[in-house]
Amino acid sequence: MKIIFIRHGEPNYEIDSLTEKGWRGAELLSKRTAKWNVTDFYCSPLGRAKDTASFTLKNADREAKILPWLREFDAPVIDPETGKRRIPWDFLPDVLDANRDLYDNHLWTKNPIMQTGNMDENYRFVTDGLDTLLAHYGYVRDGYRYHASDETNREAVIV
């Protein structure tokens, strides 16, 4: 199986769409993807993602299945230095170094900073969504690995 992840074109966040440059990029992307043998398309519910996919889907005469968990991760946390809400992956190294559990794959969502957001629930929403998608193609999670069932395939999927 080939999974191709494509990020949205240059966004205009104010209108949840694309800038002029983003629209040009989406059109150029559609020319490239036209050469690919893609079996299924999946897309975030956000406008900028749908707009990026629109040219490719139109050229392929296809539709994308909208998966809510593909939207940008929305779990702001409280910055311990400023007291303001912020995205959790944008801390300076000093904050990360003072919170070594953020590097631990079992503890990072339990960190007091991450607990100020809805991190664990959001993380599970995304990972459960990905696991469901992969299981549809015959790849079933078992701890840190995925087992390939007899139902696996060599399809190409754009996300």
Task: Give each language-model segment a name.
Residues 1-5, 117-120, 155:
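A broad, low-specificity signal for short, low-complexity segments enriched in glycine/proline
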Residues 1-71:
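Active-site-proximal alpha-helix that buttresses catalytic centers in soluble enzyme cores
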Residues 18, 42-45, 119, 123, ...:
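Aromatic-acidic/polar surface patches that form glycan- and anion
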Residues 26-31, 140-146:
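A generic local structural motif
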Residues 61-144:
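Phosphate-handling substructures
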Residues 148-159:
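Extended, basic/helix-rich recognition subdomains
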